[in-house]
Amino acid sequence: MTELKKDVARIMQVVKGEGVKERVFSAKSSYYNWSKEERELKARVENIRERKLMTLIFDLEESLQRVPSQSEYLNEYMKIAFAKIKKEDWYTEIVKAFNQDFIKSCVTWRADRAYKSSLIEIMTAMQLESKGYTVFRHKYLDMVMGVDLVAVKDAKVWYIHITKDSTFSKDKVLEKGTYRDYWVNYKRFNYQRNFENHVELFYSADEGTNNVVKNGLPLFKFDYVMDALDEQHAFKYDDNNQM
């Protein structure tokens, strides 16, 4: 059994068991009910950039030799996020005393969203492989290129972004397209991302045109994925983009 098939089997165990949660939907209040201070704190949590958060799903897969459970993922995500938050100027003693629980909720919501997207990426990779594509999924594709999956077939390549079908999430993808540098061993490497003609796959928490939902996990419909990987979004697979 390939590693991808093992990952898919593990995800199916999660889906059949406790399922996949996105706890923002069960929050006692929503964005429209929050105070100005809470909205600002939510934005600050969302704007935290930490490499260890970006690679967490891959790092846990490597250390555990399997896809982590959602609780395992959240526990590690919370540790890393708060290690970063505690260094921020805005995390004052007053904020800590009066807004700690709200900040934890914001981190949880962000972690839930990231975990769900990671599982969808794995399941989509399996869908594509079943249709004869060679699929690449790696932390450096995401960190450097801002791409979730790369699919190759018949000397053509597609660069795939997978995100939630919401204005907030779509804006995050556009923001990723503006990144211009990356640090390795304290050395800065400059580059320019270009998402033009990339494939964008959008999922919803509810069943619809693009996906079904199995115990909290959206799964893309085959036709939606296949239609998206068309000639218009294909690049020639040559020496310039082989990995």
Q: Predicted regions span which residues?
A:
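Nuclease-adjacent, charged terminal/linker segments that flank catalytic cores
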Residues: M1-W90
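Catalytic cores of nucleic-acid endonucleases
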Residues: I162-D230
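Long, compositionally biased intrinsically disordered regions
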Residues: T2-G19, V212-M243
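Rossmann-like adenosine-cofactor binding region
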Residues: Q100
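Active-site beta-strand-loop-beta-strand hairpin of nuclease catalytic cores
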Residues: A151-I160
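A short acidic/basic microdomain associated with nuclease active sites
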Residues: E121-V144, D148, V152
